Amino acid sequence: MELQLAIDLLNKEEAAELAKKVEEYVDIVEIGTPIVINEGLPAVQHLDENISNAKVLADLKIMDAADYEVSQAIKFGADVVTILGVAEDASIKAAVEEAHKHDKQLLVDMIAVQDLEKRAKELDEMGADYIAVHTGYDLQAEGQSPLDSLRTVKSVIKNSKVAVAGGIKPDTIKDIVAEQPDLVIVGGGIANADDPVEAAKQCRDAIEGK
């Protein structure tokens, strides 16, 4: 099981500083969509230049022009790139092909997908490396949790890894870990903690069953 830190609300310098502090506890560090919107792909490059062990994920949430956008993210140092599960099949296939051509990975974000079971099966067959169930900020505010979605997707896929995101914190991560996802994505639960290093350590300990 892997742990990913999602960084959304910092600038690229702050993001790299945070990543360096917690890198020993995380497998992947994500430059979130808001940072990409604010600062562009150089934010991905800046992170890549400042960490040495964790993989770098560029959360582009691609919807179209997939092969080009994946190739650009990789050029700027991304190891994993995201595309939306609601994108056209042609876009998903092009993104998978482009990522794999460079020995990189594609994560498909299931935010706003209505028929999770059907789409997860299709994405699995298309070669997605990760399928991520994602309760976004707007639904978290309504009290939704990604647990049911995680169970649904996990039950139908054969090859892809299952990732889970959405409001996960050190004090709730054990409920998620109990469902055995392949990748747990924590954002504000680490980034906004009074002690981000301790929060990251707690998440890592939970994943390792300590």
Curated annotation (Swiss-Prot):
Q: Which UniProt keywords apply?
A: Carbohydrate metabolism, Lyase, One-carbon metabolism
Identify the metabolic or biological route this protein is part of: One-carbon metabolism; formaldehyde assimilation via RuMP pathway; D-fructose 6-phosphate from D-ribulose 5-phosphate and formaldehyde: step 1/2
Set out the biological process GO terms recorded for this chain's protein: 'de novo' pyrimidine nucleobase biosynthetic process; formaldehyde assimilation via ribulose monophosphate cycle; L-ascorbic acid catabolic process; one-carbon metabolic process
Which EC numbers does the record give? Answer: 4.1.2.43
Principal EC category = lyase
Cited SUPFAM superfamilies: Ribulose-phoshate binding barrel
What SMART domains does the entry give?
OMPdecase
Q: Which domain of life is it from?
A: Bacteria
Q: Which Pfam families match?
A: OMPdecase
GO MF, any single term: orotidine-5'-phosphate decarboxylase activity
Q: So what does this thing catalyse?
A: D-ribulose 5-phosphate + formaldehyde = D-arabino-hex-3-ulose 6-phosphate
User: Of which family is this protein a member?
Assistant: Belongs to the HPS/KGPDC family. HPS subfamily.
Q: What does this protein do?
A: Catalyzes the condensation of ribulose 5-phosphate with formaldehyde to form 3-hexulose 6-phosphate.
- What is the designated name of this protein? 3-hexulose-6-phosphate synthase
Q: Which organism is it from?
A: Staphylococcus haemolyticus (strain JCSC1435)
